[in-house]
């Protein structure tokens, strides 16, 4: 036993040395510097060092001794600062530093990020954890200045021996993954400084008695706890984790689609083997315990490829296998058809050459993949559809796996809500929503020429607007397929702009057959759009995603397609200059707003567009804007109004802006019982009625009709459905959260029992009093209903229902009612907040 242990320890150290050598060989010069100095920065907390934070910051890495390069850095630093005593510490809060993910694997390149686990002793206070987190954030900024993407994750040594109640934050997967994350760590971890990882020494036959075996090693003096970190063992992954992991990988697919496809199919392969799943970490450990040196079975990415290849072959899915191979190639390889770069290690190229030869790829396919930097919108649209369908296929299969095995998800309700809404914002295809197609697939989709062609009603093609990436010259456009179609032009221009096709250098052409739009106004609209919205905008925060979405930036474009004033040529227009009403103008009482186009960014970071045309365009646009605002919403950060009228442009713009501001103020007014805004629109009069739970519009034929309507109980159009035995006053704070298009659940446990308030998509409410069941089971049942019974298929056949209901608790704080996100009430739940913990950000 002792001899074998000695052999494994020596093999562990040698393998870690080879991994470190390989990792450094794939890094840039600055990447090498950051990597080698990390232990120094976290071992010491000194004002001379980057990342210094004042206070009782946990630092000090067990058994860390600076190597020659690190010692030279410390000496130079102290000498330059005239620091005579050098750097010292007596703290030993950090058990070890480890990289995970692509580092040292075939998936690493000079641009790969560094994902670092900072494993610390258990029991650190919340205040000290926050200081350590702040120190890590400072070090990430220091690395960013050197062009290195550095992510830290704080891991208490007992993390994987407890129930996972961590919250998602940034790159952290929170409760979405737990033991799956440990599996990924064990198969990819590389020791940077501190204690070795004990799990690699435990034979597979002892996995079911892991703790007993490990305790025996320490008790009999075979190993010292001062040298080895035990994060725990596992002989299987709970099936409950697969659903949360599928959601997490879909989310990661927004930025890293190729890697996400590999990992999603891996989760699918794991579930296919359930309950006798052969984990990749176990495969890697078995090879390590019985063989010497580096091998592809010790490479995280090669292991993944091998596993998913065997799985897809076993189910006969050769189409996805081909996609998986392309994803692997694009994630890993710089391009075999390009000349070898001097700094590129030979082993990566040799291994990829062997794989490509085995796959039987043609030189043409290699050339196409290797020139991804030159891909334009057609290639990107095809790739986007393929990647998204593959991710959705894995997601569907994992849902079916959970249904077959009657499995409840382990991810907590708050995290599942946040993740599902991140996916909803990124992937859900909805009318008017601008879908971003370039998931880091190609660097530049800009086009020198873009043409917008209108087809009127009565033609062979569908009436509306078509976008082409060519000029209107017959030789350029005849026989070409359009890129996109829509019924209104603002959606097409927005799609081209936010996907990077439309730039200030693009030449925009117009072929108009029926609208009042002319080329100068189209060019001005393009400038107005780009001047108002940046192409890239911040990601939605978890806090925003835990609440109903709100309009953040709103641009309103008047008379872009239909301009009533453009038809005044040769007419005498009589009006009172002192009392001109642009909504009921002149002797003919004409509304000078013929069309309204809305482009807005909401708090979930979606870009939405809407188009209104006709006699009621103004009230339709107003009620739509107001319907996007719940009672307690913040007013939009920015509202811009643009007008393209041939006449009275400034007057129309100013008056509409005033009307919008007035209506928003009424919608968000506090303590209102009932407010009404009357509006003359052409020859008609309308009443806009503002209530806590929504806004409604009614055409008013006469004064009697008006007074009848404002005195009528509006519950006829906002019905309140109570339980059959009791009536219940609805807390006002529930009304405040009313937001159309979203089902919301509120749990009220202030009195004996639990009352449940449910707001549906139309802001109707149902109340269930004295609910006696288990809230966690209710939440899981509702989520399962949405993901299973409500499967919807888009035109492309893709599953696309991510807008799961949010769940809230009503609590009383200092005498005031507040709404907080509902979190699982599991037996080991700790109500105290936690410092940022683990992530699954792997390179």
From Swiss-Prot:
GO BP of this protein: cAMP biosynthetic process
Pfam families xref list: Adenyl_cycl_N (PF12633), Adenylate_cycl (PF01295)
InterPro entries, sorted: Adenylate_cyclase_1, Adenylate_cyclase_1_CS, Adenylate_cyclase_1_N
Enzyme Commission number: 4.6.1.1
GO molecular function: adenylate cyclase activity; ATP binding
S-S bridge residues: none
UniProt cross-references to PROSITE patterns, sorted A to Z: ADENYLATE_CYCLASE_1_1 (PS01092), ADENYLATE_CYCLASE_1_2 (PS01093)
Family, as annotated: Belongs to the adenylyl cyclase class-1 family.
Name of the protein this chain belongs to: Adenylate cyclase
Organism field: Aeromonas hydrophila
Gene encoding the protein: cya
């Amino acid at each position: 036993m002792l001899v074998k242990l000695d052999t494994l320890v020596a093999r562990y150290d040698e393998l870690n040395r080879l991994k470190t050598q390989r990792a450094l060989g794939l890094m840039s010069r600055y990447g090498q510097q950051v990597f080698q100095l990390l232990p120094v920065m976290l071992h010491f907390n000194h004002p001379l060092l980057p990342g210094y934070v004042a206070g009782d910051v946990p630092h000090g890495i067990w058994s860390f001794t600076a190597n020659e390069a690190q010692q030279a850095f410390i000496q130079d630093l102290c000498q330059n600062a005239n620091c005579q005593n050098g750097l010292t510490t007596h703290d030993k809060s950090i058990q070890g530093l480890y990289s995970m993910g692509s580092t040292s694997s075939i998936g690493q390149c000079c641009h790969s990020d560094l994902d670092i686990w900072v494993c610390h002793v258990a029991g650190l206070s919340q205040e000290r954890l926050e200081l350590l987190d702040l120190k890590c954030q400072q070090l990430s900024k220091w690395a960013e200045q050197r062009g290195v993407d550095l992510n830290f994750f704080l891991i208490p040594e007992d993390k994987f021996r407890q129930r996972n109640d961590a919250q998602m934050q940034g790159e952290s997967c929170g409760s979405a993954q737990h033991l799956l994350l440990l599996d990924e760590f064990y198969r990819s971890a590389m020791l940077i400084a501190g204690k070795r990882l004990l799990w690699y020494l435990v034979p597979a036959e002892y996995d079911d008695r892991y703790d007993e075996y490990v305790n025996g090693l320490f008790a009999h003096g075979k190993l010292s706890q001062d040298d080895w970190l035990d994060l725990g063992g596992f002989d299987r992954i709970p099936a409950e984790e697969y659903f949360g992991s599928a959601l997490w990988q879909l989310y990661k697919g927004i930025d890293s689609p190729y890697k996400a496809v590999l990992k999603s199919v891996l989760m699918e392969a794991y579930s296919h083997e359930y309950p006798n799943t052969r984990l990749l970490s176990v495969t890697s450990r078995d090879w390590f315990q019985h063989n010497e040196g580096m091998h592809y079975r010790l490479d995280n990415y090669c292991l993944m490829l091998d596993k998913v290849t065997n799985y897809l072959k076993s189910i006969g899915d050769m189409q996805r296998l081909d996609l998986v191979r392309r994803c692997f190639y694009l994630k890993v390889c710089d391009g075999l058809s390009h000349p070898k770069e001097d700094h590129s290690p030979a082993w990566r190229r040799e291994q990829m050459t062997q794989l490509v030869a085995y796959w039987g790829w043609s030189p043409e396919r290699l050339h196409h993949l290797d020139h991804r930097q030159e891909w334009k919108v057609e290639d990107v649209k095809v790739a986007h559809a393929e990647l998204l369908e593959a991710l959705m296929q894995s997601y569907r299969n994992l849902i079916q796996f959970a249904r077959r095995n009657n499995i409840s998800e382990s991810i907590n309700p708050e995290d599942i809500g946040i993740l599902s809404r991140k996916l909803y914002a990124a992937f859900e295809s909805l009318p008017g929503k601008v879908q971003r197609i370039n998931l880091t697939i190609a660097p530049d989709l800009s086009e020198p020429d873009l043409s917008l062609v209108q087809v009127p009603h009565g033609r062979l093609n569908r009436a509306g607007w078509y976008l082409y990436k060519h000029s209107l010259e017959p030789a350029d456009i005849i026989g070409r397929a359009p890129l996109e179609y829509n019924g209104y032009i603002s959606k097409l221009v927005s799609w081209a702009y936010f996907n990077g096709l439309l730039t200030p250098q693009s030449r925009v052409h117009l072929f108009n057959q029926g609208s009042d739009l002319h080329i100068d106004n189209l060019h001005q609209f393009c400038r107005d759009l780009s001047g108002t919205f940046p192409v890239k905008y911040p990601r939605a925060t978890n806090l925003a995603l835990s609440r109903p979405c709100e309009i953040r930036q709103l641009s309103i474009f008047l008379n872009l397609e239909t301009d009533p004033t453009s038809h005044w040529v040769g007419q005498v227009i009589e009006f009172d200059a002192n009392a001109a009403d642009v909504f009921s103008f002149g002797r003919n009482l004409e509304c000078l707003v013929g069309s309204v186009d809305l482009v807005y960014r909401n708090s979930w970071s979606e870009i939405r567009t809407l188009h209104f045309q006709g006699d009621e365009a103004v009230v339709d646009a107003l009620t739509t804007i107001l319907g996007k605002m719940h009672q307690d919403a913040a007013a939009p950060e920015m509202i811009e109004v643009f007008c393209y009228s041939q006449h009275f442009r400034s007057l129309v713009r100013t008056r509409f802006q005033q009307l919008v501001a007035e209506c928003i103020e009424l919608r968000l007014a506090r303590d209102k019982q009932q407010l009404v805004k009357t509006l003359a629109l052409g020859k008609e009069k309308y009443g806009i009625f503002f209530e806590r739970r929504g806004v409604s519009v009614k055409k008013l034929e006469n004064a009697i009709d008006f007074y009848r309507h404002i005195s009528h109980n509006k519950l006829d159009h906002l019905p309140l459905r109570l339980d059959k035995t009791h009536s219940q006053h609805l807390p006002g704070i529930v009304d405040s959260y009313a937001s159309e298009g979203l089902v919301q659940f509120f749990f009220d446990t202030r009195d004996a029992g639990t009352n449940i308030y449910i707001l549906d998509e139309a802001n109707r409410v149902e109340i269930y009093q004295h609910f006696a069941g288990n809230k966690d089971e209710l939440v899981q049942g509702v989520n399962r209903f949405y993901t299973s019974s409500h499967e919807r298929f888009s035109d492309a056949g893709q599953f696309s229902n991510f807008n799961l209901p949010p769940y809230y608790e009503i609590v009383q704080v200092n005498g005031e009612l507040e709404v907080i996100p509902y979190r699982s009430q599991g037996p080991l739940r700790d109500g105290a907040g936690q410092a940022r913990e683990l992530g699954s950000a792997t390179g």
